[in-house]
């Protein structure tokens, strides 16, 4: 390809012309040394070479660290003229490789940015480890504390149950008057109440049920049983004394009747 373009170049001087001796004899042209033709031939080849290979863009040599691996410059040098020859002068500049980092400080900046981004992960993990607090676990029955709070336990206000909550509690009490801990937790979760509220409601409901059915209280029953036992002991002792007194009176009356009979017999 280079030889064909060299032969077809317009600047190339065709050597087919009359001998110089004829022109020199007629004084048409001055005599030239053979170096003239070789100089013209060389200048034409250089001009073609400049057009074929555009001037290389200014490239500054950069210093690299030992850690970085330099790219082979020989391949880059051979690749640029070939691309320029195929694409032309206008597109030769776009084939340059992308600029490399100017200073080795950029990796440290990237590492610092990574270090700044890493502290966000412990916060997310800490937020994920926080326990989930459901509404029924909160102390909603505690009233607000006054400004004159002396450190004692605040006074609890009376819980106002809704109609839906009372209905569900009554239904549960109809089937079971005593709840297990698991069932109490389930009811508290479903009704958005605390376990303490469920426990107190069932205690009050059981007392009301015993009162309606006229059943003695368990605590009152124990005290009454002790009173009854003591009363029975006193009554038994009184009975023994009464029986002894009656026997004594009966024996005394029999003695009197016997003496009276003896006196009557002697009179006769």
From Swiss-Prot:
Q: Where is the composition biased (Basic and acidic residues)?
A: 258-268
MF annotations from Gene Ontology: DNA-binding transcription factor activity, RNA polymerase II-specific; RNA polymerase II cis-regulatory region sequence-specific DNA binding
Gene3D superfamilies (UniProt xref): Homeodomain-like
PROSITE patterns (UniProt xref): ANTENNAPEDIA, HOMEOBOX_1, HOMEOBOX_2
One annotated Gene Ontology cellular component of this protein: nucleoplasm
Locate the region Disordered. 70-129, 212-268
Please, which domain of life does this record's source organism belong to?
A: Eukaryota
- Write out the biased-composition intervals (Polar residues): 115-128
Compartmental location: Nucleus
Q: Which PANTHER family match?
A: HOMEOBOX PROTEIN HOX-C4 (PTHR45771:SF9), HOMEOTIC PROTEIN DEFORMED (PTHR45771)
Name under which the protein is recorded? Homeobox protein Hox-C4a
From what organism does this protein derive?
Danio rerio (Zebrafish)
